Amino acid sequence: TTLPQEILHIDTPVEYFRYFFTNEVIQYIVGQTNLYSIQCRPNKSVGVSHSEIEQFIGTSLFMSIIQLPATRHYWNSYLGHPAVNEVMSCNRWEEIKRFIHFCDNSNSVPASSPNHDKLFKIRPLLDKLRERLLLVPKEEFLAVDEQIIPTKCRSSLKQYNPKKPHKWGFKAFVLSGVS
């Protein structure tokens, strides 16, 4: 199968990211973040904007690649990096981090309920990303494998697989084509 033209013209990592994190997805995150901030502090909304969420995600991705011992070091005059400290102030970044949300907490189901979803907090975001992933056509020959995403955190979702190089982590199923 051939890829759609919109996918064939993706040349940069930013374009690839924007293919999955559409304006609709970013706007959804803006709405849920502002809603959560009002639920926490009725008199003072965080008032996050579309561009601030994009900047927050971008700086967070940058911080995951260029790692420093502490988050505040990115704004330090000696250790800091302009890709972070010129984009947003440290206090604003931490405020957005505190309130960023992907779902409406008022719709949560108790853990004892049979309808409880362990991924409730990110389920709407996962569903929106899945919609975009399903638009990418599948190749004729595919391989399915399970992959362990390594982590040292405590989570009921963490699994152990002695056959994998990283034994502990989150299990994900991977669909790979020949290309």
Could you say what each language-model-derived stretch is?
Residues 1-179:
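N-terminal initiation segments
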